[in-house]
């Protein structure tokens, strides 16, 4: 620990609340446990593994889409320490994209952030099915309930609580529909109603704090499981931990600037859809191929997204789950002026 830094320690009241949270999560993991776990090696899945080990959890699955994927060493450590059979699904970006059409069909979206993460989830679930694992655990919900996302950490207490309440009310996770499509049941202990209700009563001091000089979220969850070596690991989203975060660069390298500019201009003119970059274009093209003229999401209704025309989830939502626009209620930027870039 460097000079001037301090390790975050719980107060007496926080220790009591941490014990309550530990008890609730322990009850939320069924006995016997599902035999499989989608394991990233981060705090959330490590906590689930800690509870489920000894209740029937035997197999851990980790998707690795790049040689330096941050999840790999952490997931190996967790699986090894708990004696789990660890399946590393090693692939590259083109291999990961083999699941893209199926994921688009199930989720009915061309949102880059959603798909970048969900192709990883789909690959893990597909491997579970191949291995004959009928049911898996996930860490879904912890970030939304306990302020795991860095964009929340600077918010004042009242604003933070309001934002978390709205996030909890609108939580949706691709693992459930993808698992259903693949015939693998998904269980998420953090989404147990008792855990959700408990999290709704927490204040900022239980959610955000400074530990060893670094601001972090999910403070009470970390206090509840101090024996987990990954308790203070930084938050890496699925796309970062697995390596799928390189997909934007990958698609940009596949698309010459002139071809992208022409496609973006044509799609906006003909379809009324704003394409943001080459990755977004690739996903929209798959969306078109999968659904043709009959997407399962409504278009042209009373509350359309200005960026794609598809219906927004609800009147209070400022995020489009179909195209990924945020803030979705702000008018899109005008089409860039000037000539289309020359061919390279």
PLM features: what roles do these ranges have?
Residues 20, 24, 31-36, 95-151, ...:
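Conserved adenosine/adenylate-binding substructure
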Residues 52-54, 74-77, 102-104, 150-154:
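Short, glycine/charged-enriched secondary-structure capping and boundary segments
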Residues 21-29, 43, 47-52, 78, ...:
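Structural preference for long, well-ordered alpha-helical segments in enzyme cores
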Residues 6-23:
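Adenine-nucleotide phosphate-binding core of ATP-dependent small-molecule kinases
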Residues 136, 141-157, 168-272, 295-302, ...:
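Mid-to-C-terminal catalytic subdomains of enzymes
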Residues 7, 72-107, 135-140, 145, ...:
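A conserved beta-strand->alpha-helix junction
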Residues 1-4, 12, 26-27, 121-122:
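N-terminal glutamine amidotransferase
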Residues 5-11, 28, 34-82, 88:
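ATP-dependent adenylation/pyrophosphate-handling site
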